[in-house]
Amino acid sequence: MRNDKEEIEKIESYAKSTLGEMPEVIKLLGIHNIDMAKEQFRENQFLYLGRTNLPKKVLSLTALAVSLANGQTSSVMLHFKLAKNFGSGMLEVLDSIKAAKMSMMASTMSTMSSIKPIIEKFSGKNGNKDEVRRVMGNIKNESGMDSLPENLESLASVSFDLIGEHIQEKSELLSPFAVDQKYMFLMAFAVSVSIRYDECAKTYLTQFFMNGGKVAEAEDAIAVARFITGNKVMTSAVEILKW
């Protein structure tokens, strides 16, 4: 006969040794259904801290960035504490915050291609195509990329002020204080995967590889993004599980 109390005690012991503490959601799940608690912890290991291609510090910083982008306050603190336990300094934590902010701000470009015709219709102008091409050419040359996101060109057509601000943001927010440049792009990529903005995910992934990133490292980042994104449901259910 299965002893649920022993099962949850084993999970708690292992959680404390790997996470530093027992996540509240796993503890609460264990009260209601031990199998669901075990599944939650298994995912934590397989999709997060059990990954082996990225340093634990980078895994936790990536999880922190994705949690910040998803507004998961309780998870943010857990991943912050883990990052500190794995040796992250505050400048590296700030890099994680910057990567999350950049990805979220860039995601607003997802509507630019759709609203561009409306802007053109009601402004009575069709944009300066030569100037847009010049700006986009400069961005392409500076980035070293073969192609640029379609929505970036649409943003330039909608507003030169906004494209200039976007370039300034990218220069400031994706220039790391302490982490390797490739990890800055990897964190931004993971956030873009989580918020489902394809164009930025492709751009940041390309820049990650251009800065020496490996496919196996990208796989780990995708796993973390999947785990943290799905985990938003569980952390949001905490008050329900307390009943």
Per-range role (PLM):
Residues 1-243:
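Hydrophobic alpha-helical segments
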